[in-house]
Amino acid sequence: EAKEKFPLLDEESIRGAMWDPDAGLVTPRSQDVVNFAVESAKEKGALSTYTNTPAVGFEIKDSRITGVKTDKGTIKTNKVVIASGIWGPLMGEMAGVPIPLMPVEHPLLFFGPLPEIQGTDEFLVYPLLRDQGNSAYVRDTGRLHGGMLEWGYYEDKEPRLVDPEDIGNPEKTMTSDSMRHLNLEEIAEPLEKAFETTPILNELGWDERSSFNGLLSVTSDAGSLIGESPEVRGF
């Protein structure tokens, strides 16, 4: 049954599987959903946005937030929500608020393309396969990346933390700050296990130019950071 759901699986390599019909992926990208929400709010007059306007500091009076300093002036406000992900600790530093979050490298390798789905009009052809024992997953990229297969790995033993100050290091990044150079030796063992579960990856070979280390926002307890800080009210 697992093979029927995910034809790329070697059923001899597993003892069993679970199927979650309610699981899903945001396609083509989660950014599209966020952009839709932002534009909808702007059209209703409920939101104003300031693009290409970096925050460079905060105004704080009597341990309470009073404004956001930008390179174009100050925005007066009594509430600030930090939603900058991997850059969150840097924003916290500007307000004197420690944010217990660290960027962690997340290897993403691309294989193919897979002839059976190359040229498809679908964003996703097969269900996403999670190998929990290997802390990894395999999914196809549909038409978004021309039928490539994506393998992602979560380092569960010795995660590679990245200093937030080092995110934009030009010697370590590729086409964007959150895409870092990949060292295949660091993931050789889990990748070999992936070849056993999904041999098609080894047959197709990996695309070095498309593969990279992404960055995840990770907290010490893997939970969310929600609520007002004890150091600065309204922050």
Regions found by a protein language model. Give the residues of each.
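Short, intrinsically disordered, charge-balanced linker/junction segments flanking boundaries
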Residues: 1, 232-235
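Helix C-cap/helix->beta junction micro-motif
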Residues: 44-45, 95
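Active-site substrate-recognition segment that forms the wall
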Residues: 57-64, 74-233
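Hydrophobic beta-strand scaffold residues
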Residues: 48-49, 99
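Flavin (FAD/FMN) cofactor-binding and adjacent substrate-gating region
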Residues: 1-39, 43-44, 50-51, 57-64
